[in-house]
Amino acid sequence: MKHKVRHIHFVGIGGVGMSGIAEVLLTLGYTVSGSDLAASATTERLAAAGAQIHVGHAEGHVHGANVVVTSTAVQADNPEVMAARAAGIPIVPRAQMLAELMRFKQGIAIAGTHGKTTTTSLVASALGRAGLDPTFVIGGRLTAAGSNARLGSGDYLVAEADESDASFLCLSPVMAVVTNIDADHMDTYGHDFERLKQAFIDFLQRLPFYGRAVLCIDDKHVREILPFVTRPLTTYGLTPDADVRADNIRPVAGQMLFDVVWQQQGEEQRHPVTLNLPGRHNVLNALAAIAIGLECGADIGAIAAGLTEFSGVGRRFQRYGDIALPAGGQATVVDDYGHHPVEMAATLAAARGAFPERRLVLAFQPHRYTRTRDLFEDFVGVLSTVDALLLAEVYPAGEAPIVAADGRALARAVRVAGKVEPVFVERIADLPATLLDQLQDGDVVLTMGAGSIGQTPGRLVTLAGTQAA
């Protein structure tokens, strides 16, 4: 690719999926430019690495580019897309550029409705600790690396495979993980769950005959597609029939301790693991990483060490520490990207396990009106399990409002359910101050959502420090 393409332009370069690919291409020596609607820490990091960054979109930004890369959030009438089309510059989706990178490595693609980012990060950590130095492109900032992407010297490229727009069907990995299959982004699949399942089967069929599918059979929908997978297969889970399973699981001080059990040359093998993450759902994510590591020939001791040393990924049960409250005492702040009822329930269970006997305060910003509408009753159920609830207005992600699927409607439904009295916060900017007024000594406050609520924990910490002073 390099002898024909020198300059690659990204429209929407600040996005987490786009920025990772851009960073790897910069390291490979390509000229990278890009635009986004606003500057951010991500665009500043890319600029420091040598990318030419434009704030805002304009036709002239694509001048000199050999190819233009777009994310699914970029519309066809974007001025840079239109200028590239008029100039005959190839326009490729993000997933296609990731597929090009994967052609030069042995691709390991992590798919599934929930857990992709954490699992991808754990795989990268385990393979790195085993000396395999993988390249990775992750949908979140890996704390140890300070970035969501890195070019490694090894043979493997570990990346998330996105089913939300079916773009994972562009990829041709050598190994693939499916963590679970759940109803989300159903507009892509005509609101037909069977079509969604078939897409995962088609994704796995893109593996070569010598490849490896690593599937979580604790998930009933993943188990349902097993008969249709015709590639070499490794299963993982907590169930006794899994090829790689966890035994003797116990939570200790925010970590999960367990024994991993697997077969090797007909003999049962067992090794203790200390996972530096809370929650049984993260035990499953760790099992996927172990299965991949074993398939890559890594030593189980090195794999386990990588899981123990794992320092987390941004916005995945990210701990901000304790804040001082204006009325005295302290509260612990944790932030998480969860925005689907299933992953929210898993994260809330992890929080209960990590902080037993403490009041759990959830500040949640729903993401997309369509998701809120389609999963309304599920949201009411999971939101009713916390001790105190603050609800922000829906983050639209480009969608128009839908009647009876906004934050107020959700708050009313939770109130009617009668298990918790929600506080509705219309302006996300008011959430930190409202939280401080609500918090009590010893509380754990968990901010959750995929939208602008990600800025709330930092602002809460700053505001608390100002008021405490």
Curated annotation (Swiss-Prot):
Listed pathway(s): Cell wall biogenesis; peptidoglycan biosynthesis
Pfam family, one: Mur_ligase_C
SUPFAM superfamilies with a match to the protein in the record: MurCD N-terminal domain (SSF51984), MurD-like peptide ligases, catalytic domain (SSF53623), MurD-like peptide ligases, peptide-binding domain (SSF53244)
Keywords annotated in UniProt: ATP-binding, Cell cycle, Cell division, Cell shape, Cell wall biogenesis/degradation, Cytoplasm, Ligase, Nucleotide-binding, Peptidoglycan synthesis
Primary location recorded for the protein, binned into one broad class: cytoplasm
Compartments, record wording: Cytoplasm
GO molecular function: ATP binding; UDP-N-acetylmuramate-L-alanine ligase activity
Domain of life from the UniProt record: Bacteria
Known EC number: 6.3.2.8
Binding, ATP: 112-118
Gene Ontology BP term (one): peptidoglycan biosynthetic process
Catalytic activity: UDP-N-acetyl-alpha-D-muramate + L-alanine + ATP = UDP-N-acetyl-alpha-D-muramoyl-L-alanine + ADP + phosphate + H(+)
Cellular component annotations (GO), alphabetically ordered: cytoplasm
Family: Belongs to the MurCDEF family.
Function: Cell wall formation.
Protein's name in the database: UDP-N-acetylmuramate--L-alanine ligase
Species of provenance: Laribacter hongkongensis (strain HLHK9)
